Design a protein with these regions (language model features):
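A short core secondary-structure module
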Residues: 148, 152-196
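A short, Trp-centered hydrophobic/proline-enriched beta-strand micro-motif
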Residues: 118-126
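Alpha-helical interface subdomain recognition
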Residues: 1-90, 102-107, 114, 118-119, ...
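Short glycine/proline-enriched turns and hinge-like loops at secondary-structure junctions
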Residues: 65, 134-136, 160-165, 178-181, ...
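Short Gly/Pro-enriched turn/cap motifs at secondary-structure boundaries
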Residues: 88, 115, 130-133, 157-160, ...
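Short Ser/Thr-interspersed hydrophobic loop/turn segments at strand-loop and sheet-helix junctions
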Residues: 50, 74-78, 171, 187-192, ...
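Long, acidic (Asp/Glu-rich), low-complexity accessory segments flanking structured domains
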Residues: 217-235
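Flexible, small-/acidic-enriched active-site or ligand-binding loops
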Residues: 137, 190-221
Length: 383
């Protein structure tokens, strides 16, 4: 099933990511979680392997692959560690993506080679304390003064915020224009006035740095406007298809790791004189888990193929993310149940998988937003 309709290149990329995750990531995931930080050396290795520039063409220093290969790679890295999968997916989709798709030639030359190699990690500063799913309700302001943009405001839930060297910041430039008054900016994180207030203490993916950011008279050149003035919301929304495919793949990877742990445990654990996998209730749970994983993968690969072909896939990406993220919570919960009391202990990895999976129903658009997107698309659905 896993190899169905995959090209040789896609299989090669998947297997490379799998070997790397099993050898270099999974053995250290627990330690990184306790430290609250993914090892810098590991991130550098990811850059060397091309995992951080998968959406960037070779002319800009990337290792551009199709979205099927990208999704497969994110799944494998996330199976090794959900936090590392988050770093990879978010950096590719909303760190590299906006610069590639909307940057000027000069902006691309300045940033894409470093982003693609992992020498610079990107972050996405859209969400605010009062503006989550209602992304257009921003209070951060950017004013053009003497040829420079001066930005003031606060951003919340910034993934890669502490590690990033480049922030994609969204701010209101024309308050009277509503949604059309939001613009996007490239802000180097060493700019005076760009302040990482704190790193959040989270339920899961703890090694992924999630930060609150304040912009206090943060001043950048006029040329750091990304795309056209007033097109910021369009820029943010245009990354949703690829971003949601990535998060769906992250959820799938975490869930698959939980399933594999539960399967191994069920084969070894003996109760009532036989391995618990031979008890029908446990066997049925594993069968359901396996089926749900395969169903999620098919949805993800379908959306990824549409994205690669340049076809609209907003609904398909939302379906993939919605199903995969909710499936992941169920599969991880079942993995804990199969482990019994041991599943509740930190000595076993399944409790971490459960905590890591939960975020996938929230970021890059909550489950409720995904259902809204899917339902909206049904208005034009031909029966």
């Amino acid at each position: 099933m896993h190899d169905i309709e995959l090209s040789e290149e896609q299989v090669m990329i998947r297997d490379m990511a799998r070997d790397f995750a099993r050898g270099e990531i999974a053995p250290h995931a627990q330690a990184w979680e306790k430290a609250g930080w993914i090892d810098d050396g590991l991130v550098a290795k990811m850059g060397e392997l091309g995992l951080l520039g998968m959406v960037v063409p070779e002319e800009w220093g990337g290792t551009y692959v199709d979205y099927v290969a990208y999704a497969l790679a994110v799944e494998e890295i996330s199976a090794g560690d959900g936090a590392t999968g988050a770093l990879m997916s978010i950096h590719n989709s909303v760190g590299c993506g906006p610069v590639l798709n909307y940057g000027t030639e000069e902006q691309k030359q300045t940033w894409l080679p470093d982003l693609a190699s992992g020498q610079a990690i990107g972050c996405f500063c859209l969400t605010e304390p009062q503006a989550g799913s209602e992304a257009h309700n921003l209070r951060t302001r950017a004013e053009l003064r003497d040829g420079q943009w001066v930005i003031n405001g606060a951003k919340q839930f910034v993934s890669n915020g502490k590690r990033a060297k480049l922030a994609i910041v969204f701010a209101v430039t024309d308050p009277d224009l509503g949604k059309r008054g939001i613009s996007a900016f490239l802000v180097p994180t060493d700019t005076a006035g760009f302040i990482v207030d704190r790193t959040e203490h989270k339920m899961g993916i703890r090694a992924s740095d999630t930060c609150a950011v304040t912009l206090n008279n943060c001043t950048i050149a006029e040329a750091n406007l990304l795309g056209e003035r007033g097109k910021g919301l369009s820029i943010a929304l245009s990354n949703l298809e690829g971003g949601r495919i990535g998060i769906a793949a992250q959820a799938l990877g975490i869930a698959r790791a939980a399933f594999e742990a539960a399967l191994a445990y069920a084969r070894d654990r003996v109760q009532f004189d036989k391995p618990i996998i031979e008890h029908q209730s446990i066997a049925n749970m594993l069968a359901d888990m396996h089926m749900q994983l395969n169903a999620a993968r098919l949805l993800i690969l379908h959306a990824a193929r549409l994205r690669t072909a340049g076809k609209p896939c907003l609904s398909q990406a939302s379906q993939a993310k919605l199903f995969a993220s909710e499936m992941a919570e169920k599969v991880c919960s079942s993995a804990i149940q199969i482990h019994g009391g041991y599943g509740y202990l930190e000595d076993y990895p399944v409790e971490k998988y459960y905590r890591d999976a939960r975020i996938t129903q929230i970021y890059e658009g909550s489950s409720e937003i995904q259902r809204m997107v899917i339902a909206r698309e049904l208005k034009n659905y031909l029966v």
